[in-house]
């Protein structure tokens, strides 16, 4: 018995962005998964909204610079209203070296100065809300840019420091540590580990410029709760969580070399994969839900979670993110 299901559909495309209708799978398989029987007091508006995705750098240039910007989105708000959409979803607009289209974030609480300012962002939020349009932003919690101040501090501080504990650093193998800690390849190709000047290696499951956070570090938890509150305080209505099935990792085990992680063919259904879809990740999202619920109305969220279908419902529980993309 399935209930409350809406699959991800690309309803239309145009030169500015794309409209996504019903982006969520709002709890599945009630009989197979008893925990899915939990019900929130009200269904999230995100569950069946028409949502228009915007890549800010190519949407609308308000200055003639040749680059789209936040003010350009505000200028197009009447157009967006005429489409009949209910929300806009902004791809990353944060300061970034743009190694991965903005998903390498150098500052989680600011606007890339090439795109405008926080004042421009506030104006855009106000223009959207006066038209009844909600605003969703991307959050990238699995990794940062290597230009983030935290990672620069980690490199400067050295092995065993609190600064380095925010990321996944390990000693190498071999007589002189010259071999990476595991044999993994990254999702975008090449080794998943890069060696730094003092001989340690750091993990990056995407590009070398995107070091993975260590979510066993309490400081990382506190930081992202603050990030969510920062944007919620500015009026953001919802969050799309990038690589939501990542974050929690277990590198203290003896079988790491057997996992062919880049091929994506080693997903398991019991939450014990060393890197992806671990059971511990749900503790993070329950923590985030407490942040969302401090607001009236509560902030909404949706997980980008590439997981086995039978585990999608875990991310969509009302005491966690509430929705998840359905990639099947």
Per-segment meaning from a language model:
Residues 88, 239-241:
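Hydrophobic residues within beta-strands of alpha/beta enzymes
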Residues 234-238:
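A glycine-centered loop/beta-turn motif at secondary-structure junctions
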Residues 305-328:
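Noncatalytic carbohydrate-binding groove/subsite architecture in carbohydrate-active enzymes
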Residues 19-34:
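Short, Lys/Arg-enriched N-terminal segments with co-localized hydrophobic residues
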């Amino acid at each position: 018995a399935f209930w409350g299901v809406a699959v991800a559909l690309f309803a239309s495309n145009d030169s500015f962005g794309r409209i996504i209708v019903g982006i969520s799978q709002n709890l599945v398989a009630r009989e197979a998964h008893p925990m899915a029987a939990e019900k929130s007091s009200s269904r999230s508006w995100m569950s069946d909204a028409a949502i228009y995705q915007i890549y800010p750098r190519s949407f609308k240039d308000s200055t003639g610079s040749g680059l789209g910007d936040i003010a350009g989105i505000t200028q197009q708000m009447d157009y967006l209203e005429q489409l009949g959409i209910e929300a806009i979803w902004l791809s990353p607009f944060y300061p970034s070296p743009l190694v991965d289209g903005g998903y390498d974030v150098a500052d989680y609480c600011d606007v890339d100065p090439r795109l405008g300012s926080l004042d421009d962002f506030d104006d855009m939020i106000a223009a959207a809300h006066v038209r009844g349009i909600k605003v969703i932003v991307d959050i990238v919690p699995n990794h940062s840019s290597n230009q983030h101040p935290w990672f620069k501090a980690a490199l400067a501080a050295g092995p065993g420091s609190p600064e380095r504990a925010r990321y996944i650093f390990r000693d190498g193998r071999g007589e002189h540590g010259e071999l990476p800690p595991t044999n993994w390849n990254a999702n975008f190709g090449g080794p998943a580990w890069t060696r730094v000047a003092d001989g340690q290696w750091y993990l990056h499951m995407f590009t070398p410029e995107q070091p993975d956070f260590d979510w066993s570090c309490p400081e990382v938890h506190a930081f992202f709760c603050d990030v969510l509150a920062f944007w919620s305080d500015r009026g953001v209505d919802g969050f799309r969580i990038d690589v939501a099935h990542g974050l929690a990792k277990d590198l203290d085990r003896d079988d790491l070399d057997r996992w062919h992680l880049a091929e994506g063919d080693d997903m398991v259904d019991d939450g014990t994969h060393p890197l992806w879809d671990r059971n511990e990740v749900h503790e993070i999202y329950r923590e985030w839900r407490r942040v969302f619920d401090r607001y009236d109305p509560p902030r909404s969220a949706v997980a980008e979670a590439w997981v086995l279908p039978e585990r999608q419902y875990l991310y969509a529980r009302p005491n966690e993110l509430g929705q998840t993309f359905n990639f099947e």
